[in-house]
Amino acid sequence: MADKLYQMEVQAEPQYVAEQSSVANDVYVFAYRVRITNTGSEPAQLISRHWIITDANQQVQEVRGMGVVGEQPHLDPGQVFEYSSAAHITTPYGSMKGAYQMMADDGRRFEASIPEMTLVAPRVLH
């Protein structure tokens, strides 16, 4: 089956960053760590990213760009790439999901889905 050639497993884990957040100013910062594993049989390079970030008010930010953290990693079968970044929203909870555009060494483009992450700040007492 051709699909097994072009497979990436994406795991993402968010964490609230209290030191960089400002509840009084409606700024909630979430760091996240992403692990991308080439589970297919074809080497491939991450070309670009597309994130959809939604806050509790259903305000959506779409973030698109080349690569991740300044890199366009090339992953051989079984190889893993990890990186960390952050997102800001204006409510204490929301979600993030998206996809990476990949290009296999044979020239085929495919998408690696980023599973939805729930962003939740701990309860803040006023």
From Swiss-Prot:
<dbReference type="InterPro" id="IPR023065">
    <property type="entry name" value="Uncharacterised_ApaG"/>
</dbReference>
<dbReference type="GO" id="GO:0070987">
    <property type="term" value="P:error-free translesion synthesis"/>
</dbReference>
<feature type="domain" description="ApaG">
    <location>
        <begin position="2"/>
        <end position="126"/>
    </location>
</feature>
<dbReference type="Pfam" id="PF04379">
    <property type="entry name" value="DUF525"/>
</dbReference>
<dbReference type="InterPro" id="IPR007474">
    <property type="entry name" value="ApaG_domain"/>
</dbReference>
<dbReference type="InterPro" id="IPR036767">
    <property type="entry name" value="ApaG_sf"/>
</dbReference>
<protein>
    <recommendedName>
        <fullName>Protein ApaG</fullName>
    </recommendedName>
</protein>
